[in-house]
């Protein structure tokens, strides 16, 4: 086998590993549509909405009643998050990608976390405030 072929197989294996990892992370997190998340927030007391976007994004727009901890600060904010230990934390960002990573991190930290599918863009598109 030539070095070029070995390199190609290695790249294919790495891409496969990356895709499998993303699928496993996605499947390990519960996802709520904007409408279902809104209904859950209205009906249940032990549900919290967490904005994981940057400070600048938060200043532009946010979902009323949500808390804010940027994704890059999640791991170092465990003490701040302890007040939500018994709640379900629904994370959101702009499109739902960063919030999925945040929910995965929170689950690893022992929290009951979920993702808002399609993020604040989906929330606004559904006519929610």
Located regions from the model:
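Short, surface-exposed ligand- or partner-binding patches at beta-edge/loop junctions that are enriched
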Residues: 92
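Rhodanese-like catalytic fold shared by cysteine-dependent sulfurtransferases
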Residues: 1-36, 40-43, 47, 55-88, ...
């Amino acid at each position: 086998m030539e070095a070029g072929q070995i390199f190609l197989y290695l790249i294919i294996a790495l891409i496969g590993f990356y895709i499998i990892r993303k699928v496993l992370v996605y499947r390990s997190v519960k996802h709520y549509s904007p409408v279902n998340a809104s209904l859950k927030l209205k009906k249940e007391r032990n549900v919290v909405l967490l904005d994981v976007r940057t400070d600048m994004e938060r200043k532009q727009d946010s979902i009323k009643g949500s808390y804010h901890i940027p994704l890059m600060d999640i791991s170092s904010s465990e003490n701040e998050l302890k007040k939500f230990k018994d709640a379900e934390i629904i994370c959101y960002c702009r499109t739902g990608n960063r919030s999925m990573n945040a929910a995965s991190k929170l689950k690893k930290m022992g929290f009951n976390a979920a993702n808002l599918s399609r993020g604040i863009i989906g929330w606004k598109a559904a006519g929610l405030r």
